């Protein structure tokens, strides 16, 4: 059915809570015009202050480059983190990308929205889990059964 939702729960972002997964799915189901919901965090470095590294030179990343503008005057931006993402089945079925055209944001918890790519990332995740008493089925506060 067109209402079917596909959830992406990447193993490189392990610190999700069941209620967060349900919330993201419900967000998409309740927003009929949305194609997907992406988990995002606020971006620390604004893309309008960024450059592409091209051999020995820097190339402005955007056409409206603002490297010297005060950050607080720039529009807020976010980055996709792959913590919990949801997309309507029809978007995938019809050969679109994995998000479609109308993408709704879900602000992921920055302290748990890790991306485990390197050994250092894994060590950081293990340290967090040990520090907070997290384990399989026990994410969040140590007293939380989830």
Predicted regions, residues:
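Conserved alpha/beta core of the MobA/IspD/sugar-nucleotide pyrophosphorylase nucleotidyltransferase superfamily
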Residues: 76-146
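Short acidic donor-binding loop at the edge of a beta-strand
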Residues: 1-7
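Secondary-structure transition/hinge residues
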Residues: 1, 29-32, 133, 137
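Short histidine/acidic/glycine/proline-rich micro-motifs that form metal-
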Residues: 11-15, 112-113
């Amino acid at each position: 059915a067109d209402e079917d939702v596909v959830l992406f729960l990447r193993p490189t972002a392990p610190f999700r809570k069941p209620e967060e997964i349900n919330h993201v799915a419900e967000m998409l189901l309740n927003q009929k015009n949305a194609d997907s919901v992406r988990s995002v965090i606020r971006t620390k470095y604004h893309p309008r202050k960024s450059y592409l590294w091209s051999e020995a030179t820097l190339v402005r990343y955007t056409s409206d480059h603002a490297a010297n503008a005060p950050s607080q005057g720039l529009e807020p931006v976010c980055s996709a983190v792959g913590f919990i993402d949801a997309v309507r089945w029809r978007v995938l079925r019809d050969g679109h990308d994995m998000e479609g055209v109308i993408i709704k944001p879900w602000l992921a918890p920055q302290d748990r929205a890790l991306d485990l790519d390197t050994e250092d990332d894994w060590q950081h995740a293990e340290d967090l889990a040990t520090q907070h008493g997290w384990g399989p089925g026990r994410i969040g506060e140590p007293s939380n059964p989830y």
